[in-house]
């Protein structure tokens, strides 16, 4: 189990990313446009946005345990929880492979 503070930090980052998404996109467009003076000013504003508002800093975590590695996107849980839940029949439509 991940620490509660790590889970909370990830939730906080997700909120920041959502809050600043439009502003970041607009500033990035200006920076990449061409006019050097305008681009410089936009870059300064972009640097003033919090670091955690950058979507690159988001990391997928298991919804049940908070585990950051072995995450299965389709189900939103870690491989360990997926295996356990699938074995117990808790995930509809998932069964053990046999060939």
UniProtKB/Swiss-Prot annotation:
Top-rank taxon: Bacteria
Protein name: Small ribosomal subunit protein uS14
Quaternary structure, from the entry: Part of the 30S ribosomal subunit. Contacts proteins S3 and S10.
One Pfam family matching this protein: Ribosomal_S14
General function of this protein: Binds 16S rRNA, required for the assembly of 30S particles and may also be responsible for determining the conformation of the 16S rRNA at the A site.
Covalent S-S links between cysteines: none
InterPro entries xref list: Ribosomal_uS14, Ribosomal_uS14_bac/plastid, Ribosomal_uS14_CS
SUPFAM superfamilies registered for this protein in UniProt: Glucocorticoid receptor-like (DNA-binding domain) (SSF57716)
Family: Belongs to the universal ribosomal protein uS14 family.
GO MF entry, a single one: structural constituent of ribosome
Any one GO cellular component localisation term in the record: small ribosomal subunit
Gene: rpsN
Keywords: Ribonucleoprotein, Ribosomal protein, RNA-binding, rRNA-binding
NCBIfam families: PRK08881.1
GO biological process terms, semicolon-separated: translation
Organism listed in the record: Phocaeicola vulgatus (strain ATCC 8482 / DSM 1447 / JCM 5826 / CCUG 4940 / NBRC 14291 / NCTC 11154) (Bacteroides vulgatus)
